[in-house]
Amino acid sequence: ITSTSGDFAPPERAKGLRPIYPGGNDNSGLGLDVEKNGNEISVTCMLPITKSADYKIKVPDNLALEIESGCERASNITVTGMKNEIDIQSCHAIDLKNVTGPLVLSTISGNINVTFTGMPDKPVSINAVSGEIDITIPAKTAASLDLRTVGGAFYSDFDFTEPKNNMKKVVGAELTYSLNGGGPKFTIATVSGNVYIRKGN
């Protein structure tokens, strides 16, 4: 844990006492329960929902990462530079930079932004209910795309359909597309948000 911000101190009246939380203990002094079981490390926020905190945690880039953020906390999630599996379930924004996946991402009301520096050899699933999805993938990516939206639209500078201002657009539909001969399956779905798929380097 490289940096934090938040109010972790107990009230003055609790001097000499320790906080008790359901499901774990604040064994870090930062409102977190940190446990190690074999090769697995779990970090759980124990703060009551009336308190807020931001955490920056540095981990090896080849670590498989799983994050679950409940809807009671208005917490955006940012992940940078990971080269292994990432699984994130959230109610808020998800921002991934310089990742290779594979990915399983899901949010209810936030936007999802992903920049790939390489492509996974396993399927990718990205879902948002009311947020938008914006993905940048290398131009030479070989993938099988399964795109779905109810009330949103698809935009891309890959060669999907008729051009519109250097982007292509398909509205309220399901689209299956083989990119550069096909490859691992990409499932990207929204209910009311738009989907943007961009060419990267």
Residue positions per predicted region:
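Acidic (Asp/Glu) and glycine-rich low-complexity loops/linkers
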Residues: 1-72, 78-89, 104, 141-149, ...
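Extracellular beta-strand scaffolds
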Residues: 64-65, 72-77, 83-85, 93-95, ...
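A contiguous pocket-lining binding segment that forms or flanks enzyme active sites
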Residues: 124-125
